[in-house]
Amino acid sequence: MMSRLLVFLMLGAAFMLVVSANDAYGDEPAFKDLNQGDESLGKRKSCCPCWLRGNCFWGQNCYPEGCSGPKV
């Protein structure tokens, strides 16, 4: 019984590591934006739609046209 619990906890920890690693990667500015000297480094992989009326979570920016549109 303890070994099953241990395996379950290890799988849960591995899943959390993968999720947090993907989340941290999504916060990085796109290499293309850095190359072009774009002053709005807010064009990121993680963005939120504007139907949330600018109420984005985790410091994301709101774009009317997906992640590449102008920031609202």
Curated annotation (Swiss-Prot):
Q: Which GO terms describe its molecular function?
A: sodium channel inhibitor activity; toxin activity
Report the protein name in the record.
Delta-actitoxin-Avd2b 3
Offer a single GO CC term for the protein.
nematocyst
Major place of residence: secreted
Protein family membership: Belongs to the sea anemone short toxin (type III) family.
What InterPro entries does the record point to? Neurotoxin_3_Anemonia, Neurotoxin_3_sf
Keywords for the protein's UniProt record, in alphabetical order = Disulfide bond, Ion channel impairing toxin, Nematocyst, Neurotoxin, Secreted, Signal, Toxin, Voltage-gated sodium channel impairing toxin
Q: Name one Pfam family in it.
A: ATX_III
Disulfide bridge map: 47-62, 48-56, 50-67
The listed locations are: Secreted; Nematocyst
Prodomain positions? 22-42
Give the domain of life. Eukaryota
Q: What does this protein do?
A: Voltage-gated sodium channel (Nav) inhibitor. 1 uM completely inhibits insect voltage-gated sodium channel inactivation (DmNav1 from D.melanogaster).
Q: Where is the signal peptide?
A: 1-21
